[in-house]
């Protein structure tokens, strides 16, 4: 086991604070509409330019082990806020730095760290309650656009794109962000349910220009196993032909003779038909087939349920207004499913999302909810250079997360004002002893740090701005750093999601209070460096007397 280096009391805390300050100072320059960029060197390719707090924090690794511990703890604040709310990482870092700085001063002055921690926790929970109480729901897509614009550092176009996408696919819909090959940023919306399986044969194509198979007012057969012969389903096919409606077969696979028979029937014009493989694998495939069945009002033909193809009647098939299939994807629009059953299925999947511990499973379940509940929108981010596209994509991701958070828990005044207003809830709050009161005061001071930093990044004196906002009795009075005006933040359109502000404070206080209560730090001792030359030559026997 390697030897360890141990530091105590002030020495340990000072080193830790140096690490906290290095990381926080690098992150906080990005805060606010006039925040600056940070350039991150990459060992391959062009450097990355970003204004995303968590991206900056993740890149920082310090050579001094003890300083690095402090930096890593604050990095944890940014990461946790990003995971929970998806935005607010810079605010969380600034809050954590402010609480740690003030807290360590108090410890150095002889106060009890555990009582300070209790005071900080008490104050934080009080402010969080005030933020929740001040939140109001998002009323329209204009407010959604404002939240997106603020989070994208003032780029109104990004806010509009996100509001547009949310309006089209609903609050539950999936919105993904991709890099565009061109210069323009655009939104593409896929209505209905889309899954990543294309037609099994190009002979199914009905639109030769677009190379797509388009079926209107269509029956859908959902079969769990492979289809290698069509003999068992001849009665069903005859019934479909009589109805003069097209048929889509979704099965594990359609092989050999069965596929050839379908293609021949299609080419002869006797049957409008197409076949695709079922999406997913294993248990996920079963679940997705069941989703499609509920969406289209059909049944999955499964041997587990004792169903046989020869016994299937036309009323067991699903229905949809329109199905479009290209070589990669199938889209089902306007399925014939019962609304109550679809809602019940969505609720069931939501329960699974709550229970799962795997991020991958959660993502896949959320996709299924979106496909059932709304649709899918893709925002393709364009730009002149790869570096610009990556930087914009970071901001679009942040803005998208912020708007989702706003829809979940509502909005509060932005620009750091919600924290200062929340701090007024601490008036009259006292702890059990003077040290706990000091902890409450630390939080009250720290709540001003984000507004001070926003003002400072805009080239204005932060303490003057914070003083003016604190003294105002109007709850939405604040400083618009973009225009350098004071006034009603709601009228300026400077709003933040309540969830982002709340999460930033909770995570910052949680990690900061742990650092304040640190008394000793242990790290591996650096290995002594061996000399650069090769191993020394041993003495050569019998050569002593030659000198």
Curated annotation (Swiss-Prot):
SUPFAM superfamilies: GroEL apical domain-like (SSF52029), GroEL equatorial domain-like (SSF48592), GroEL-intermediate domain like (SSF54849). This is Chaperonin GroEL 1. One of its GO terms (cellular component) is cytoplasm. It catalyses: ATP + H2O + a folded polypeptide = ADP + phosphate + an unfolded polypeptide. This protein shows ATPase activity. Forms a cylinder of 14 subunits composed of two heptameric rings stacked back-to-back. Interacts with the co-chaperonin GroES. It is an enzyme of class 5 (isomerase). ATP binds at residues 30-33, 51, 87-91, 415, 496. One of its GO terms (molecular function) is unfolded protein binding. HAMAP family: CH60. Induction: By heat shock. The lineage of its organism: Bacteria, Pseudomonadati, Pseudomonadota, Alphaproteobacteria, Rhodobacterales. The keyword ATP-binding applies. It is found in: Cytoplasm. Keywords: ATP-binding, Chaperone, Cytoplasm, Isomerase, Nucleotide-binding, Stress response. It comes from the Bacteria. Together with its co-chaperonin GroES, plays an essential role in assisting protein folding. The GroEL-GroES system forms a nano-cage that allows encapsulation of the non-native substrate proteins and provides a physical environment optimized to promote and accelerate protein folding. Residues 533-547 have a biased composition (Gly residues). Residues 525-547 are annotated as: Disordered. Its EC number is 5.6.1.7. InterPro entries: Chaperonin_Cpn60_CS, Cpn60/GroEL, Cpn60/GroEL/TCP-1, GroEL-like_apical_dom_sf, GROEL-like_equatorial_sf, TCP-1-like_intermed_sf. Belongs to the chaperonin (HSP60) family.
